[in-house]
Amino acid sequence: MGHGADAENTTAATVRERLETVGATDVATTLQALATPSRLRILARLQEGPCAATELADAVGMEQSACSHQLRLLRNLGLVTGERRGRSVIYALYDNHVAELLEQALHHVEHLRLGLRDAPVTAEAAGAR
């Protein structure tokens, strides 16, 4: 996961503690940013690599103004970056965490559709980590 966070050693208690430290509202705001199909399409395209705003709008089938509005929101939330190059702004995912969020959401929905379920983590197993 990066930044010293080891998913294998994270217990439910530490996730709760971290949520209180970071702020549940900030985490909810980040997740809400993923709550529209247009933003998900933008992030999915940017997962393939950086892209100019005009090309991005075409790639995701949006009007330029609507795409720019969504990009501004995603940028303000720290999910994408924008770098001016001449007359264009090149957008990219902020970091690999954004790609991981998208990948995990897709993986979860695919599991739901297939009726699959990961083995639940028991309190005993979590303590043994």
What are these model-derived regions, one by one?
Residues Q70:
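Residues within the DNA-recognition helix of helix-turn-helix
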Residues M1-D26, D95-R129:
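Amphipathic alpha-helical dimerization/coiled-coil segments
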Residues P50-C51, R75, L106:
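Residue-level detector of secondary-structure transition/capping positions
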Residues R18-S65, R85, V89-H97:
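N-terminal helix-turn-helix DNA-binding core of bacterial DNA-binding proteins
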Residues D58, R75-N76:
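Alpha-helical residues within the helix-turn-helix
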